[in-house]
Amino acid sequence: MTRIKRGYIARKRRTKIRLFTSSFRGAHSRLTRTITQQKIKALVSAHRDRDRKKRDFRGLWISRINAVIRGNIKVYYIYSNLVYSLYTGQLLLNRKIVAQIAILKQNCLFMIANDIIKTKNPLRLYSGKV
């Protein structure tokens, strides 16, 4: 095989990768092979965790709503029944908005829940067994 002289092209490619990993510690920012592997690993983790973040936030919103709803003595409602009632009542409130209301203005959430309770079928309320 003939020798391929890359010269500045290879250096340019390695420099670009080095700039990406310049904040990494130890050999992960110095050795070319390790740099390449760590760059791939970092990009894979970033891609995976973007989806993971969406799942984590949805779980956080659900647990916040459930904690506030169950904490009230006057209106004992569980999360699943609340979301079902919001859905059947065609209220355009997603979990993120309801969680913000639950944290910042609990009275508003209880007003919404009471309104749903008055208009909905009482069988859907939580009484120990559904």
UniProtKB/Swiss-Prot annotation:
Gene3D superfamilies: 6.10.160.10, Ribosomal protein L20. One of its GO terms (cellular component) is ribosome. One of its GO terms (molecular function) is structural constituent of ribosome. One of its GO terms (biological process) is ribosomal large subunit assembly. It is found in: Plastid, Chloroplast. InterPro entries: Ribosomal_bL20 (IPR005813), RIBOSOMAL_L20_CS (IPR049946), Ribosomal_protein_bL20_C (IPR035566). Keywords: Chloroplast, Plastid, Ribonucleoprotein, Ribosomal protein, RNA-binding, rRNA-binding. SUPFAM superfamilies: Ribosomal protein L20 (SSF74731). CDD domains: Ribosomal_L20. Belongs to the bacterial ribosomal protein bL20 family. Binds directly to 23S ribosomal RNA and is necessary for the in vitro assembly process of the 50S ribosomal subunit. It is not involved in the protein synthesizing functions of that subunit. NCBIfam families: rplT_bact. HAMAP family: Ribosomal_bL20. PANTHER family: 39S RIBOSOMAL PROTEIN L20. This is Large ribosomal subunit protein bL20c.
